[in-house]
A protein has these predicted regions:
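A short, Lys/Arg-rich alpha-helix, primarily the initiator
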Residues: 1-14
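Residue-level signal for the short linker/turn that defines the boundary of a DNA-recognition helix
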Residues: 6, 16-17, 43-46
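Residue-level detection of the helix-turn-helix DNA-binding "recognition helix"
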Residues: 13, 27, 38-40, 67
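Alpha-helical residues within the helix-turn-helix
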Residues: 13, 24, 53
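Short alpha-helical DNA-recognition segment
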Residues: 16-35
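DNA major-groove recognition helix of helix-turn-helix/homeodomain DNA-binding modules
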Residues: 27, 44-61
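Short, charged recognition helix plus adjacent turn
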Residues: 53, 63-90
Length: 90
């Protein structure tokens, strides 16, 4: 559970979201989300789906991919978003 918890925390930090923001988006309390992010409780399938949707990732990314692989995907998504906002060569 620690690896998933670490992924949840690191991804949230990269997006710049607070635990309270993520918890509100999921319809749970901040302490309930804190438990998931700190390895005290495993997210349910429904919660995994909500978290994956929030970050535009798959549930499989959250559950099974190595942390570095997921972080690279997140960074690539952020670069794509920035490139759309600021076209290169302009």
């Amino acid at each position: 559970m620690e690896d998933i918890a670490t992924k949840l925390r690191r991804i949230r930090e990269i997006f710049g979201y607070s635990q309270d923001y993520v918890a509100n988006r999921m319809g749970i309390s901040q302490p309930a989300y804190w438990q998931k992010e700190n390895g005290k409780r495993m997210p349910s399938e429904e919660r995994f789906g909500q978290i994956a949707e929030l970050y535009n990732l798959s549930v499989e990314d959250l559950k099974w991919e190595e942390l570095n692989t997921v972080l690279i995907k997140v960074h690539k998504m952020q670069i794509e978003i920035l490139e759309k906002k600021v076209p290169l060569g302009v």
